[in-house]
């Protein structure tokens, strides 16, 4: 029977940091990159003693810098720390045996030339602004990598985001991405000249500093070849011999690890991006390990029975540069809790966001009874030189919330109070019990599938475990109360708000290693998008834009009484037939009746314009257009119908387009499917023609408006004459209040306009000025049709 984890034997995560293997365990995996395959294979078939011996051998095989006692003075401490770091970097460079380094070193034979070695052996006397040599060993290595990544481009430029960059600028940017240290374009150019002085003529050097076809470099405006490292970043699928140099530590030291389904794509960092976030970060060190200890062994990673994963790379330096959060594929679905924090505009993110990619190497069998699962998670807020800048040791009320998701669905949510730290290190909890149960369950499923004797069942169990880890993600949030918040809370006893400050967010992604791989964990910083409140956005519209006024509307505009409603100009309302049908906005019908359409109630003033200059096509429409465009269920306001009887032999020479009534001059149609404007005919205008004024009031159709509003027929043809004298017609319109109630069509009764017509003397003067010729409307003496008994509903 398979043994299970013993909960009482689980290693607490509040223990002190684990001691290294033979004082060198943190370097063992880094320096044994070439032995990853054999190391993992031997671990799978060796007992505990053999593993122990091998770890000690690895520690002696790749020794560290000697650990000198640190002096008490701060300057001496800093110098010793810097010297140790430089020595470690030299060892890493000497033991770098990754395929990319080998291929690069093999091609760059000049690096082994006597002149180059003598140059590098000289003491570095020139120092940069950061206090380090301008071209230290670290920067020199990054410089050589930048030469490979950025091919020669002559006088041409590489254009990106609207700016042009020369090769030296690209090299300087590349060096900054690898080392975090700035070197200017001039420093790169000077270094190239120095190296070219004694490496000129070497084929490998010439290949890196000069183009193959010199005649092409004379074209200033030609398109420069894309830097290989940028091409690889923009197109992860594109093959590039330098694609893996983006993260040299990760790829060089774990060459057996290949991209897998669910990996994050390589990021693309535009030039000029704010990569100084790492310098201003609060977290300066990170450590994470997960292992199994045998019952009789010490609770240490170097004595581990099995290591699920361990941190790969330097504890204080991520293996990859910071990456924008938006470049993480599917981060919103993988980290819902983080997405809610980013979207919270009231609480902008002001802490480090750490992305951890955990590769777990599962055990092939159950551990012995009494085995213990250990998880060590440390965050170091101490600055390498300044120390406890944030005052972490003075903070209280440390809390850690953990959200674990499977396929974006939350499967676990916990909250823990952390003990107050006495140093700059914080040790969050990472649910040891949950992980122990998970590993036991997965191991049990695998054993049952293997014991069944069905190879397909074993493969299915392995695929199930791999798919589970790919769909697994987690988000942790660390909060603490600064001393200033505690003082404020003490001063104001009534204040019960949340004074805690968000200190860090950890975003976890997981996968299961392939056979022969060692479980490792990498970490990098994520840069969230800028706060929405600090980014530029379009200014809101301060008001409604009104359409420009036509020239006729401006010329005909006159001061009028405040209570008079003025209709829009018809030539502003009429569309050309070729234009598409538009939906005209409906507006509240005016409460002015026909009697109030003129300036004075006593007589008609045909010489005064009743146009409203500020009304246009985009603001309001005539009442008739409202009836045409909408269903009859809308009850529009209307006025009583009128009748006109009387002969007239005068031609029509005037068209007044200041009234919103439906008539042939306006050119509307009344059918619901034909509810659009059509252009009216152009009429000869004579402002003293009273017959044309009356003709503008009333259409020539004999069909009632009630029938037209329900059918498809348009207005009838123009009538050619008006039988009878206009003056003989009798019109009456009863007085209507200013705010009248809409009346249905069935209840309307005919009325007359006698009270609205001018005096007979004025009418004689107007009629006397008319000519007897036929007009374009066919309303002259030769007209055949008339207006007898014609009834029109005025709307």
Curated annotation (Swiss-Prot):
Keywords: Activator, Conidiation, Nucleus, Sporulation, Transcription, Transcription regulation. Residues 84-95 have a biased composition (Basic residues). It is found in: Nucleus. Transmembrane segments: none annotated. One of its GO terms (cellular component) is transcription regulator complex. Residues 128-202 bind DNA. The keyword Transcription regulation applies. This is Conidiophore development regulator abaA. It comes from Penicillium rubens (strain ATCC 28089 / DSM 1075 / NRRL 1951 / Wisconsin 54-1255) (Penicillium chrysogenum).
């Amino acid at each position: 029977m398979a043994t299970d984890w013993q909960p009482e034997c689980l290693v607490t995560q509040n223990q002190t940091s684990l001691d290294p293997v033979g004082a060198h365990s943190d370097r063992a995996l880094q320096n044994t990159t070439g032995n990853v395959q054999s190391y993992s294979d031997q671990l799978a078939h060796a007992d505990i003693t053999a593993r122990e011996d091998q770890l000690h051998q690895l520690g002696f095989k790749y020794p560290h810098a000697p650990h000198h006692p640190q002096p008490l003075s701060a300057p001496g401490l800093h110098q010793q720390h810097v010297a140790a770091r430089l020595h470690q970097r030299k060892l890493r460079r000497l033991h770098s045996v990754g395929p990319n380094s080998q291929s690069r070193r093999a091609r760059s034979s000049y690096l082994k030339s006597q002149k180059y070695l003598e140059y590098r052996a000289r003491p570095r006397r020139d120092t940069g602004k950061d206090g380090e040599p301008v071209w230290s060993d670290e920067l020199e290595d990054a410089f050589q990598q930048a030469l490979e990544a950025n091919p020669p481009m002559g006088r041409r430029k590489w254009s990106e985001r609207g700016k042009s960059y020369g090769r030296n600028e690209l090299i300087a940017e590349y060096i900054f991405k690898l080392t975090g240290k700035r070197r200017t374009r001039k420093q790169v150019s000077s270094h190239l000249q120095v190296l070219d002085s004694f490496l000129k003529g070497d084929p490998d050097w010439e290949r890196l500093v000069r183009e193959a076809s010199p005649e092409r470099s004379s074209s200033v405006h030609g398109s420069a070849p894309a830097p290989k490292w940028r091409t690889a970043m923009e197109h992860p699928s594109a093959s590039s011999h330098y694609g893996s140099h983006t993260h040299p530590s990760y790829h060089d030291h774990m060459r057996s690890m290949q991209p897998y389904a669910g990996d994050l794509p390589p990021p693309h960092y535009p030039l000029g991006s704010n990569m100084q976030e790492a310098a201003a970060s609060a977290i300066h060190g990170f450590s994470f390990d997960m292992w199994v200890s045998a019952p009789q062994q010490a609770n240490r990673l170097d004595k581990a029975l099995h290591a699920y994963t361990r941190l790969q790379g330097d504890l204080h330096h991520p293996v990859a540069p910071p990456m924008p959060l938006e470049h993480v594929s599917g981060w919103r679905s993988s980290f819902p809790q983080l997405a809610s924090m980013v979207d919270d505009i009231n609480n902008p993110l002001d802490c480090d966001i750490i992305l951890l990619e955990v590769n777990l190497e599962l055990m092939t069998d159950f551990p012995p009874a009494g085995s213990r699962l250990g998880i060590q998670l440390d965050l170091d807020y101490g600055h390498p030189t300044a120390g406890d800048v944030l005052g972490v040791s003075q903070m209280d009320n440390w809390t850690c919330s953990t959200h674990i998701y499977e396929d974006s669905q939350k499967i676990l949510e916990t909250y823990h109070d952390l003990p107050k730290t006495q140093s700059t290190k914080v040790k969050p909890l990472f649910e040891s019990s949950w992980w122990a149960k998970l590993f036991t369950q997965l191991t049990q499923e695998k054993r049952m599938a293997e014991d069944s004797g069905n190879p397909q069942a074993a493969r299915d169990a392995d695929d199930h475990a791999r798919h589970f880890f790919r769909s697994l993600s987690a988000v942790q949030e660390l909060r603490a109360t600064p001393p200033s918040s505690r003082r404020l809370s003490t001063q104001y006893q009534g204040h019960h708000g949340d004074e805690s400050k968000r200190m860090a967010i950890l975003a976890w992604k997981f996968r299961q290693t392939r056979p022969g791989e060692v479980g490792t964990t990498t970490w990098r910083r994520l840069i969230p998008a800028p706060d929405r409140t600090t980014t530029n956005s379009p200014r809101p519209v301060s008001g409604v834009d009104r359409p420009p006024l036509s020239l006729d509307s401006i010329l005909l505009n006159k001061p009028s009484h405040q209570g008079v409603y003025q209709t829009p100009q018809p030539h502003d309302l009429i569309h050309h037939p070729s234009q598409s049908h538009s939906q005209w906005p409906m507006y509240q019908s005016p409460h002015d009746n026909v009697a109030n359409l003129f300036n004075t109630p006593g007589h008609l003033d045909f010489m005064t314009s009743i146009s409203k200059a500020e009304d246009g096509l985009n603001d309001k429409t005539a009442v008739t257009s409202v009836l045409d465009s909408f269903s009859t269920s809308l009850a529009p306001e209307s006025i009583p119908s009128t009748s006109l009887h009387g002969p007239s032999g005068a031609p029509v020479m005037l068209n007044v387009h200041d009234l919103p009534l439906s008539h042939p001059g306006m050119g509307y149609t009344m059918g619901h499917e034909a509810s659009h404007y059509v252009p009216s005919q152009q009429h000869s205008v004579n402002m003293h023609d009273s017959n044309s004024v009356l003709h503008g009031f009333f259409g020539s159709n004999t069909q009632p408006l009630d029938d037209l509003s329900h059918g498809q027929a348009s207005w009838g043809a123009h009538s050619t004459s008006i039988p009878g004298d206009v003056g003989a017609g009798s019109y009456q319109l009863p007085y209507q209040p200013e705010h009248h109630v809409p009346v249905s069509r069935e209840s309307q009764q005919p009325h007359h306009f006698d009270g609205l017509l001018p005096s007979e003397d004025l009418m004689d003067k107007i009629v006397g000025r008319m000519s007897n010729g036929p007009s374009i409307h066919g309303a002259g003496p030769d007209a055949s049709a008339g207006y007898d008994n014609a009834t029109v509903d005025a709307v």
